[in-house]
């Protein structure tokens, strides 16, 4: 429930472009992540724009702040704050359509944001020294509307994404993209949009990001909290290092109503 995926070639994985999307009423409890209205792109069965972070252990600090948390996914932060951990941080898909020529998905994550209030996750956070603070990405909710429209143009590999964003006061909206295999390239030479490209061995995913106003962009290969392998050793007792991933953020000026496309 709350999942969608479209592909260009169901018969040949090696030449197949795919994208997936999640906006689920089950929220982000158990093994689910705080990734409402997030998408991923793939080519040849390998990730392009993709959720980041490492699942070191269920409530490890890195796993909570950089894998489960919203900052790890291709979605939206509000004043740097993400979605709730628990069933309270939910989304849903109120409309969808699928045909040979065109597909459409509407995700609604208007109820996903705010402080962590789940008794279960508050207890787990306390036990694992995970602090649900504004410094770590959780605070009062200001989101009134976050609706993400995605149009899939048949088997062309082209999709159009349009975000409706409304808050109860002026806020900074941040558009997130991540890669795990190769660094992204970011081109800001055109004043109309920002061009971000993700690549893997066989393909590429090009994002052309338009917005209501001027964006401040940042790209980094550092996690918000480091990924330390303290749990899994090989047969020689060596704890292999977890690789860094790449993170792109485009942040708006303060605005109560905003649009990304």
Report residues per predicted region.
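Carbohydrate-active enzyme catalytic cores, enriched for enzymes
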Residues: 1-48, 98, 252-259
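Catalytic Cys-His active-site segments of thiol-dependent hydrolases/isopeptidases
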Residues: 49-54
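CBM-like, beta-strand-rich accessory domains located in the C-terminal region of large
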Residues: 55-261
């Amino acid at each position: 429930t709350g999942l969608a995926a479209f592909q260009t070639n169901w018969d040949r994985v090696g030449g197949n472009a795919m994208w997936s999307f999640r906006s689920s009423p089950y929220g982000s409890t158990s093994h689910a992540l705080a990734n409402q209205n997030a998408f991923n792109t793939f080519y040849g069965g390998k990730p392009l724009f993709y959720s980041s972070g490492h699942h070191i252990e269920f409530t490890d600090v890195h796993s909570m702040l950089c894998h489960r948390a919203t900052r790890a996914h291709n979605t939206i932060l509000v004043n740097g704050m993400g979605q709730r951990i628990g069933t309270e941080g939910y989304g849903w898909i109120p409309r969808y359509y699928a045909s040979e020529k065109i597909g459409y998905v509407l995700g609604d994550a208007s109820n996903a944001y705010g402080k962590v209030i789940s008794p279960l996750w508050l207890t787990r956070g306390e036990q694992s020294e995970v602090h649900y603070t504004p410094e770590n990405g959780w605070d009062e909710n200001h989101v009134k509307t976050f609706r993400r429209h995605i149009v899939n143009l048949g088997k062309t590999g082209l999709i159009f994404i349009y975000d409706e964003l409304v808050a109860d006061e002026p806020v900074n909206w941040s558009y997130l993209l991540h890669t795990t295999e190769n660094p992204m390239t970011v081109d800001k030479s055109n004043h109309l949009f920002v061009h971000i490209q993700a690549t893997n061995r066989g393909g590429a995913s090009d994002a052309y990001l338009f917005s209501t106003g001027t964006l401040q962009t940042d790209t980094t290969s550092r996690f918000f909290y480091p990924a330390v392998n303290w749990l899994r050793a090989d047969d020689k007792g060596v704890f292999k290092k977890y690789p860094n991933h790449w993170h792109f953020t485009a942040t708006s000026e303060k605005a109560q109503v905003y649009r990304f496309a």
